[in-house]
Amino acid sequence: MAANYSSTGSRKEHVKVTSDPQPGFLERLSETSGGMFVGLVTFLLSFYLIFTNEGRALKTANLLAEGLSLVVSPDSIHSVAPENEGRLVHIIGALRTSKLLSDPNYGVHLPAVKLRRHVEMYQWVETEESNEYTEDGQVKKETKYSYNTEWRSEIVSSKNFDREIGHKNPSAMAVESFTATAPFVQIGRFFLSAGLIDKIDNFKPLSLAKLEDPHVDIIRRGDFFYHSENPKYPEVGDVRVSFSYAGLSSDDPDLGPAHVVTVIARQRGDQLIPYSTKSGDTLLLLHHGDFSAEEVFRREQKSNSMKTWGLRAAGWMAMFMGLNLMTRILYTLVDWFPVFRDLVNIGLKAFAFCVATSLTLLTVAAGWLFYRPLWAALLGCLALVPIIIARTRVPTKKLE
């Protein structure tokens, strides 16, 4: 099926060298001015990211605390208790579905919440390595383009290659990837809402060892179905298909017992739906495994804390990069003097580090003002430390 496309030989590569006149002072100054605008936008966005992150973190913490104080655990999942109607309930049990999920084209059938068909095509892939250097007053860029064949799940457009001749890929796959989802999923007598079903994403690879070749033109090798004349030596355009599943919904002699999950949700009849809190937020949790209600909320609080620190770090980094770009023009003004240029570069980075750290702490404190005023005041004092240190070092250097 790959006869119309490039044959797969050994790894191919070629080198291209381009040259441009070395930019003058005014040209470099103009480029730096553009970087200042990008830096300003990045700098301002960092404030928004840090401030809103604090609001989100505290809001989530309060939401989880409220949920833990309200949650109840029914005596049995095999009966619907009327006294829990509208309440936040803690449910543990094995998943069940009403019918098998299948892909008849490949003879795959199994009890699961989700069945995913993953398709890859053998294609040419271009990689490039660049090296810039100055020679005879010109800036030269040497780029090495390499071409190799790989299995890829996305179409690689050979039209964007530096050299398409001899490395042409098909424009579409003969088979498409898809995910089938069971329409109804239960735990005991309770039906899971669409939001809970979406959270069942613990995909595991499906072994094809006991399946036969579904068609004459499809060959099974290991855990793949190959649309290829020779899977051992594939050609560009050949396709291979694998399967994975999430949420095993029945005991299976080959795949194991049905998957057990822990759910925190609102009971409405025999439905498990999102719970609306007093603050207007919704609570809908699903964890893979058997956990007590306290353990579920403890895991959620830990996840919230990790996300908060991750976004704080991202905000600080955005602020640091923004300040670097905004002050880059000072480096450009002195880059004709190597020794002085290096000193200025170190000083600008130290300045950006101190200012980014101080402003990040101040922004975090501002985000806490509405929730924890005392902690906000403490953070505000800590935020002044880097600035005080930086200012006290300046007179010392002058005296030296």
Swiss-Prot record:
Q: Which GO terms describe its molecular function?
A: identical protein binding
Residue ranges that the UniProt entry lists as topological domain Perinuclear space = 53-313, 367-368
Give the Pfam families listed for this entry.
TMEM43
The annotated topology with respect to the bilayer is: Multi-pass membrane protein
What subcellular locations does the record give?
A: Endoplasmic reticulum membrane; Nucleus inner membrane; Cell membrane
Task: Indicate where the modification N-acetylalanine is found in the sequence.
Answer: 2
GO BP term (any one): innate immune response
- List UniProt keywords, sorted A-Z: Acetylation, Cell membrane, Endoplasmic reticulum, Immunity, Innate immunity, Membrane, Nucleus, Transmembrane, Transmembrane helix
Q: List the disulfide bonds.
A: none
GO cellular component entries: endoplasmic reticulum lumen; endoplasmic reticulum membrane; nuclear inner membrane; plasma membrane
Chief localization class? endoplasmic reticulum
Show which residues sit on the Nuclear side of the membrane: 2-31, 335-345, 390-400
How would you summarize the oligomeric state and partners of this protein? Can form oligomers through the transmembrane domains. Interacts with EMD; the interaction retains EMD at the inner nuclear membrane. Interacts with LMNA and LMNB2. Interacts with SUN2. Interacts with RNF26; this interaction is important to modulate innate immune signaling through the cGAS-STING pathway. Interacts with CARD10. Interacts with gap junctions proteins GJB2/Cx26 and GJB4/Cx30.
Report the protein's function: May have an important role in maintaining nuclear envelope structure by organizing protein complexes at the inner nuclear membrane. Required for retaining emerin at the inner nuclear membrane. Plays a role in the modulation of innate immune signaling through the cGAS-STING pathway by interacting with RNF26. In addition, functions as a critical signaling component in mediating NF-kappa-B activation by acting downstream of EGFR and upstream of CARD10. Contributes to passive conductance current in cochlear glia-like supporting cells, mediated by gap junctions and necessary for hearing.
Q: Give the UniProt family note.
A: Belongs to the TMEM43 family.
Official protein name in the record: Transmembrane protein 43
Traced from the root, the source organism's taxonomic lineage reads: Eukaryota, Metazoa, Chordata, Craniata, Vertebrata
Q: Which gene encodes it?
A: Tmem43
